[in-house]
Swiss-Prot record:
GO cellular component, as recorded: extracellular region
Locations listed in the record: Secreted, Extracellular space
Family: Belongs to the glycosyl hydrolase 5 (cellulase A) family.
Catalytic activities: Endohydrolysis of (1->4)-beta-D-glucosidic linkages in cellulose, lichenin and cereal beta-D-glucans
The protein's name in its UniProt record: Endoglucanase Cel5A
Organism in which the protein naturally occurs: Gloeophyllum trabeum
Biological function: Has avicelase and carboxymethylcellulase activity.
Residues of the active site: 45 (nucleophile)
Length: 56
């Protein structure tokens, strides 16, 4: 069984993307492809908090 098609992440196709991490980013208040462009941009955490935000 093959996995899902690679996601286009920040303009780069990445095979075997960690979908659990993607879902967690969303749960942390991030957005998943908010304009349906097919490209996701997830910002890593900055500052001293425990939550990473994600915005396209």
């Amino acid at each position: 069984v093959t996995g899902p098609a690679p996601l286009k992440f920040a303009g780069v196709n990445i095979a075997g993307f960690d979908y659990d991490a993607l879902v967690q980013a969303x749960l942390n208040x991030g957005y998943l492809d908010s304009d349906n462009s097919g490209t996701l941009a997830i910002n890593t955490e900055t500052g001293g908090g425990n939550t990473a935000s994600x915005v396209e």
